[in-house]
Amino acid sequence: MTMHFDPTFESLRTYSAPQWFRDAKFGIWSHWGPQSVPMFGDWYARNMYIEGTPQYEYHLRHYGHPSKFGYKDICALWKAENFDPESLADRYWKAGARYLMTQATHHDHFFNYDSKLNRMNSVNVGPHKDILALWKKAADRLGMPFGISEHLGASFSWWRVNKGCDRFGPYAGVPYDGNDPAWQDFYHANQEHGTDDPGAAAPWYTQNPQFRDYWLRCVTEMIDRFHPDLLYTDGVLPFGEHWMDKQEAPDPEAYRLGLQAVARLYNTSIADHGENRAVYLQKDRRPEIFSVGVLDIEKSQLPGIMPEPWHTDTCIGNWFYDVHYPYKHPEQIIEMLVDIISKNGVMLLNILQRPDGTIDDEASFILDKIGEWFAVNSEAVYGTRPWRVFGEGETRVKIDGFTEEKTSWSRSDIRFVQKDGAVYAFLMGAQGGEAVALRSFADQPVRSVELLGAGPVPFTQEYGVLLVSLPERLPSLCANALRII
């Protein structure tokens, strides 16, 4: 067991994910901040400065022109007046979550805690509450590992558009409020990136050395203040230039500050617990990079079992509250979770909060349905490990970055996990009253089969096929689980 990490690849590649993370399987994320105020979804702080986007048009009509009413003014409107982290944490625990992720800062450079490095924070502006401290208190009461997400690394180049102006109409040529010298500490002195929108906010990470140093100071402040069990970076390990699964050889110098942050996270955990219980999540899919922590795959999955745990983050709808965006059905969320854990993954689900801090009735319904499923099937989730195969059947989830389509499962589709000598088989498409054929037990005599929530069920095993008869009424709305010994 490593008892101290140096800020080098050689040292940090000795990392191994802690037991609690391997066992937890499911967490909930509060991806929440002042961008929830307009209730118009993700990247509002950016798109409101891009002439012609729906969010720009909404902002113009609802708040006024961004030269007069900018994002700093949106931040002042955020009050979080009905935010009750204790009751929300209780709801999330009841729904099956076994860790809590909270947002320290998004690309909008607004901090959700009492920062000494950034005056634009939730104690000084808007809610006048230390959002992260309140969340941590609630998580600690329940014994839930507590995580923080930082999206700061991309902010400097992502927010170049606040330095622009309209090209057409009555405000053509009038600078947006991001040009105000009095607010450069918030909007960034990022003129070097120009003002044009490149579409994908490229480059994701700036080369600006002053901002990179500032990023490290801020992340260090987050770690020292909250001693998180998880730290999530929205991007690759800073400040790498590659994304997803590109194969270029990494330049160690580019990652120097990122490695310092990861080492501090782990060494803080060792000092607190006598061992490292912390998890670092980032999105570079090259093993030589992600082996310093745990690979995160945003809104997508993997085609097969990965030897070490991996992580998916997803949401019930948009990333920030959006009155226009439909939510996933509970069944889709549960089926995603089952497919992920069968491949050694862990799933983080963003439950959207309105600007006042509450969740809406649809989100509450989703939590209730997930909780009902966990009440029956939790033993097939917590503490399990992948089996020798992840499943049976021809249906596969669509593997495409940032794409999540509901999978149409058939009666032959099964997903497996194992624990304590039992194999759990999730029935992805089977209906009540059917007989299910499982072909992965040809060389393994079966002594008993139990349907979780219903009890023992009839089965036969011959000619390499385990045939299980299901009752007319199944206990769960989807992904019913067999316990096979």
Please give the residue ranges for each predicted region.
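Mature catalytic domains of secreted/periplasmic carbohydrate-active enzymes
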Residues: 2-485
